[in-house]
């Protein structure tokens, strides 16, 4: 048996009566519990030789994981492999439930039945205003069995969870349909929740609105314009683009500062500026444009697919001096890959709701258990209008999202198979990433971010640059130092972006990619990516 410590041993959580418990102390309890299982005859010791225990620390209070989960591995044809993993989220798991949870997980590895397990997760609460059986005391859910990992149908028992879809790579999962619905129906969600989506962020607002960060960004851009003007290379029209506009506050503050600096220096750049706001959500664009105030005459809004800005903005190819992207890449489709003992696997997930959540939905909305997957599909297709009453449709959507969980399994990737490689990259690029990675690793393949990045670079003027504010993993080794998502936001999701992958994409396009810490707020997880063109 191999135990993986996927977090700093000094990480702490609040224990009972206000005490602090470290990751190391909690890990010690896991080892003690594991040691008792063979003594109690609750595990076949022959299974331990291929078992891996992963000790995680999922920092997102809302997420898609139960405290203890089982992962099995299959080959490309779907046949069971020997590799097995038990993953434990030490931030959620209750100490007194640890031994029975591990016993259930061990039995599930060799069982073809779904075994009950006591919940809920430690500290988990339903979203505000949502009655959620997923967080009810004494709720029970099931540990996925070996049969479940192979994709066998979920048992129809009233005590079992309800699968909402088949196993698929993360990039093809239902999560992205929920995400798309959220951004298309943002106004409906905010009305139902009673707060703007920014309130779901850890600090209640985005770091991109920090005034000093904006002032420095404006100063850097103004300096570039001055240098180009000194060389008689400044275009008559100065194009700048912001992708991922949020409420529009950041763009408004940036334009306020740019105009003030321009007037102070008498440089007359503001009158030549053409500022474009691009976003996926029409409602977001309308809100952002209304925020522009006196800058509206120089601002245009463009609805675009964030994965392919070039498709909409092709008229700006090689013309844009400044592109700013904020909090977009962490909300684009990705895969997760795993390397174990030199073999590569893709993580496949199956969305489900627990038996307790299913019972609540059946009772609250007057539907049959067997109708749940179909009704969720209809919700994702047409929105809350899947119900005759809009408010009930919204309540159903919010309750399903609050209770949504993911089963996981590992599907082996055959040598030479490139179906998991993002467009624009090759197996060689992935091999280069893995060469710089720890031997055993689980990491994001940020497909959507890589495509968006590659489809933004052609917009840049030869002296232009791209600046991205997001949560990045700049080096592959950092994937062993903490959980990088996905986390669950209020209606949406977030995952850290593989910065090492973007560095490879940039190199292919002739750009160096740099990462700088966001120094304007202590403790911020945000990193600033910026590009420089190679000579």
Where in the sequence are the language-model features?
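Long, intrinsically disordered low-complexity tandem-repeat segments
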Residues: 129-150
